[in-house]
């Protein structure tokens, strides 16, 4: 399976959900403003993430700060180091919570 395209933030969560709930194995290559990153998925579990000199969940949450993300998913065996031990479901829920909190903050009125 080979997927590529350009996503906005919430669609990024949808893509991650699709890949994990479909039990895919492979590498999701991302590009944000010419900065490259990698999300390693094995049997539907997010094993590791690298972006902007960060590894693990810190890198994944940094990716979420960007509105536009170019991606390419290449299916295949992944035998790398696992740095993320939370279930993909838990990670997706954390991403959604973080997204909702940021949107609520952006929309909240300023009190003077």
Specify the residue positions occupied by each region the protein language model found.
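Acidic, Ser/Thr/Pro-enriched low-complexity segments and adjacent helix/loop capping patches
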Residues: 1-112
């Amino acid at each position: 399976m080979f997927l590529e395209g350009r996503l906005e933030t919430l669609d990024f969560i949808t893509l991650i959900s699709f890949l994990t709930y479909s039990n895919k194995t492979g590498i999701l290559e991302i590009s944000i403003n010419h900065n490259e990153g990698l999300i390693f998925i094995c049997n539907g579990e997010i094993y590791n993430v690298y972006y902007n000199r960060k590894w693990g969940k810190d890198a994944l949450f940094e990716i979420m700060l960007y509105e536009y993300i170019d991606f390419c998913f290449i299916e295949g065996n992944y035998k790398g180091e696992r740095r993320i031990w939370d279930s993909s479901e838990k990670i997706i829920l954390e991403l959604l919570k973080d997204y909702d909190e940021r949107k609520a903050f952006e929309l909240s009125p300023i009190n003077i």
